[in-house]
Amino acid sequence: MDSSTWSPATTATTEPLKPHERIRNAADISVIVIYFVVVMAVGLWAMCSTNRGTVGGFFLAGRSMVWWPVGASLFASNIGSGHFVGLAGTGAAAGIATGGFEWNALIWVVVLGWLFVPIYIKAGVVTMPEYLRKRFGGKRIQVYLSILSLMLYIFTKISADIFSGAIFITLALGLDLYLAIFLLLAITGLYTITGGLAAVIYTDTLQTAIMLVGSFILTGFAFHEVGGYDAFMEKYMNAIPTVISDGNITIKKECYTPRADSFHIFRDPLKGDLPWPGLTFGLSILALWYWCTDQVIVQRCLSAKNMSHVKAGCVMCGYFKLLPMFVIVMPGMISRVLYTEKIACTVPSECEKYCGTKVGCSNIAYPTLVVELMPNGLRGLMLSVMLASLMSSLTSIFNSASTLFTMDVYTKIRKRASEKELMIAGRLFILVLIGISIAWVPIVQSAQSGQLFDYIQSVTSYLGPPIAAVFLLAIFCKRVNEEGAFWGLVIGCMIGLARMITEFAYGTGSCVEPSNCPTIICGVHYLYFAIILFVISIIIVLVVSLFTKPIPDVHLYRLCWSLRNSKEERIDLDAEEEDIQEAPEETIEIEVPEEKKGCFRRTYDLFCGLDQQKGPKMTKEEEAAMKLKMTDTSEKPLWRTVVNINGIILLTVAVFCHAYFA
């Protein structure tokens, strides 16, 4: 069967929003409704059965989570709808190399669980900027990093997820774009606001199962349709569109033919679209930032009940990260084989006809596969998968962003805020994030360029390396001080912003219409730029630190690797300020009799976790015991051995996969 003339693709691509492409049958609608009912039921169960009335309960799930929901939540938080659209789209356009982004994580989840999380737990922190404040003292690094992280969440993570989710919804349902996005964000925000981190982790666990089952089913259908793996490799290399000219314009051959190295991860260091030194070292820097210092990821690990559960969750996530190559990237490539004219289009007028944008339609590879290939019922399941990935990713971002705002920004504005006030502030900030997200949709929509995955990774390459450098040195080099860390962050981010603003001002371009950005600025691949920026940031941090006063060890016990097992009492650099903040205004709340609350008010308080049923006030000994539990990193010898062996196996699997597909 000639892939380029396959009849369903031909009939379906002329009008993406025809009724026969939309989900209008009872089977699909029933599956979607059942999915939403189950997700809301799980969220409500978590709301009723977990402690959400304290900052520790809402933001860290009371440090009570076991390993398997932690691992599932790590995976679901990472795999958003941007992966289904971006990974599959880049796979359709350029082959399997983009799967290397997923496999690189196998190494860094081990680094996270074994090296970074023990320090964070011993430090007794809730957020990553809070760790830097304890490590270096002062407020400017904490506030600077919090605001930078919130900007990154809004303009990369949230915008990318909403954009990619919108592509799928528009293609499959034909609903009004803004109505669909508003409903998704409303439901997402609802169980994030009401349930806290426990609800997020439990719903993530459910949605991980949905994603994996649905993705495996679609992968089976796709490989069956294409004729197996060997036929897939052969047909992909011949998946060339027939329309390659428009009037006097003839597209260059390299713009529409599959790459000769499509089935290799490691590519030419100078001419490759993902050069192997960049994929090996540059990507590792981005992974260090994302997996070891990003609030969304680390917060899941901090919620685990002990270190063995942290490590087991990281290993579980690592094994899950093996799958996207086979259930997202390769199905995206198969979509190019089955619907070549649509997915591999290069002539601007043809692309605009198929997907509404002139630069290419690779982003719709996975959604097209779902709409065209899946039977009734299963198509609804796959829509649920996309909704699950979108919502789980957004809930993770909303919860972690509200944590950052509440603990690192709001407490600087309201130093004596009560526990209840902090809880309300965190929930209201989620509403603000939802509002900004909806307002950002038209900008993302107008910037549709077919370069979604590259856009996300390039922005990360420009802003992430200085943060990665500061955290790495903060933990493994105790000589680094506040001045070095601050100026390393500021100068590094200024360099990254200069490159980013220049590149986006000129436009990233495409194969058909290359960018006019000067080679000296934009000619360096973004993964190579990440390496350069990381090295510059490290040099600045070290040089400034060596020429300024060091931090005494008494302030660093259990905050850096060399002093991680110290038993001495640590004097925090901002201890006096913390003493002031630890005096919440609780006396006002005690004066309000519980009986005077009406039925509506009691229901509202229960719904939002603001009931705060007060038990007896904790004694000094009980507070010390609670603090000891929250900062305990001890492990039982048997389980420590089990997770260590699994960590070694995971690293071995990572090396094998890279070598096999090199």
From Swiss-Prot:
GO biological process: intestinal D-glucose absorption; renal D-glucose absorption; sodium ion transport
Disulfide bonds: C255-C511, C255-C608, C345-C351, C355-C361, C517-C522
Entry-listed glycosylation sites: N248
Keyword Phosphoprotein: yes
Assigned GO CC terms: apical plasma membrane; plasma membrane
Description of activity control: Enhanced by the interaction with PDZK1IP1/MAP17; but unlike SLC5A2/SGLT2, PDZK1IP1 is not essential for SLC5A1 transporter activity. Possibly modulated by cholesterol binding.
The organism's place on the tree of life at top rank: Eukaryota
Chain ranges on the Extracellular side, renumbered to this chain: 1-24, 91-95, 170-176, 222-275, 332-375, 445-451, 505-525, 661-662
Catalytic activity entry: D-glucose(out) + 2 Na(+)(out) = D-glucose(in) + 2 Na(+)(in); D-galactose(out) + 2 Na(+)(out) = D-galactose(in) + 2 Na(+)(in)
Pfam families per the UniProt record, alphabetical: SSF (PF00474)
Subcellular location: Apical cell membrane
Chain positions with Phosphothreonine modification: T587
PROSITE patterns linked to this entry: NA_SOLUT_SYMP_1 (PS00456), NA_SOLUT_SYMP_2 (PS00457), NA_SOLUT_SYMP_3 (PS50283)
Transmembrane segments: 25-47, 67-90, 96-117, 140-169, 177-193, 203-221, 276-295, 310-331, 376-406, 423-444, 452-477, 482-504, 526-547, 643-660
Keywords: Cell membrane, Disulfide bond, Glycoprotein, Ion transport, Membrane, Phosphoprotein, Sodium, Sodium transport, Sugar transport, Symport, Transmembrane, Transmembrane helix, Transport
Record's comment on post-translational modification: N-glycosylation is not necessary for the cotransporter function.
UniProt cross-references to InterPro entries, sorted A to Z: Na/Glc_symporter_sf, Na/solute_symporter, Na/solute_symporter_CS
Positions in the Cytoplasmic compartment: 48-66, 118-139, 194-202, 296-309, 407-422, 478-481, 548-642
GO MF terms held by the record: D-glucose:sodium symporter activity; galactose:sodium symporter activity; water transmembrane transporter activity
Gene3D superfamilies: Sodium/glucose cotransporter
Topology of this chain in the membrane: Multi-pass membrane protein
Domain remark in the UniProt entry: The cholesterol-binding site is formed by transmembrane helices TM1, TM7 and TM13.
Function recorded in the entry: Electrogenic Na(+)-coupled sugar symporter that actively transports D-glucose or D-galactose at the plasma membrane, with a Na(+) to sugar coupling ratio of 2:1. Transporter activity is driven by a transmembrane Na(+) electrochemical gradient set by the Na(+)/K(+) pump. Has a primary role in the transport of dietary monosaccharides from enterocytes to blood. Responsible for the absorption of D-glucose or D-galactose across the apical brush-border membrane of enterocytes, whereas basolateral exit is provided by GLUT2.
Record-stated family: Belongs to the sodium:solute symporter (SSF) (TC 2.A.21) family.
NCBIfam families tied to this protein: sss (TIGR00813)
Protein's name according to its UniProt entry: Sodium/glucose cotransporter 1
